[in-house]
Regions:
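Thiamine diphosphate
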Residues: 1-172
Length: 172
């Protein structure tokens, strides 16, 4: 299993972009590929990060936060996307409850990852397509601020979830 770092983590820049775009509710289920992001949010008292036990529970929290006037972000490993399919299809999407999904890409086809991540790594983007969730992929060389701005604009325009998929090394 290999998760080679491809330069410094963009987690600090990402958190600044999220806050600058008005995201003010942060929850999710941690993943090692998101450890830099989780650590920053967890130690930032103004972020009020809530660690959930399941990804579908985090989506429920995000729905409530949105209804309460917040702009939510939910983080998860891509295996958590599988756990979240029903909540995304029958709650978030159906009832126009937007959230930014920040999803780590375990089992990315070009990487040597643990065997349990390989299939989900192959089918994650098609699942997002089937759910009609627009997404962008964050690579180590990708500037994050324009991607966060795109996500905010898309969420506000559609009132639906959108996703930023983080490759290994981006938010570690």
């Amino acid at each position: 299993m290999s998760h080679e770092s491809k330069g410094p983590s963009k987690a600090p820049e990402f958190v600044a972009a999220l806050k600058g775009a008005g995201f003010d509710f942060f929850c999710g289920v941690p993943c090692s590929l998101l450890k830099g992001l989780v650590s920053l949010l967890d130690h930032d008292e103004s972020a009020h990060y809530i660690s959930a036990t399941r990804e579908d529970s985090a989506l429920g929290m995000a729905a409530g936060a949105y209804l309460g006037g917040k702009r939510p972000m939910v983080l998860m490993q891509n295996s958590g996307l599988g756990v979240s399919v029903n909540a995304l299809a029958s709650l978030s999407t159906m009832y126009d409850l937007p959230a930014l999904l920040v999803i780590s890409w375990r089992g990315e086809p070009s990487l040597n990852d643990a065997p349990e991540h390989i299939l989900m790594g192959q089918i994650m983007l098609p699942i997002l397509d089937l759910l009609k969730i627009p997404y962008r992929v964050l690579s180590p060389g990708t500037p994050v601020e324009p991607e966060v701005a795109w996500a905010k604009k898309e969420m506000l325009a559609t009132k639906k979830p959108v996703a930023l998929v983080a490759k290994a090394g981006v938010l570690e």
